[in-house]
């Protein structure tokens, strides 16, 4: 509760604006969410916190107030968010079974999810299969369909020499 004495309603709203739904009369939980994340940092005695780019304002709130409570700042590492596998332009959601791939999903479930994934041929923008290749597969040192670099895959995709079914199957394997 000590943290509550240091943070205003407008600061809490701003910190959560990219993560929780904001409206004129927000639910208390929407305002408390960023504070809970900051408190987790304290209770876990975290040296580093990993999150998506949408967590940036929450991390800034923690950074700005954590020392006032006698705790050391931690390092924040942010990465791009993977989009929903089932809807263009949306982020992954825990409520959409086929919209996300989880670490503990079986190979069979991953294959099933990728078969159903939104994937417009020759399109790179808002294409979750291409984002998965760019953000996960290639940075981990893997290749897809003999394309050594992501740029090679993108070029082949845009030219139409790779089809959606081929890409999805390669991602699943």
Model-derived features: positions:
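Divalent-metal (Mg2+/Mn2+/Ca2+)-assisted nucleotide/phosphate chemistry catalytic cores
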Residues: 1-75
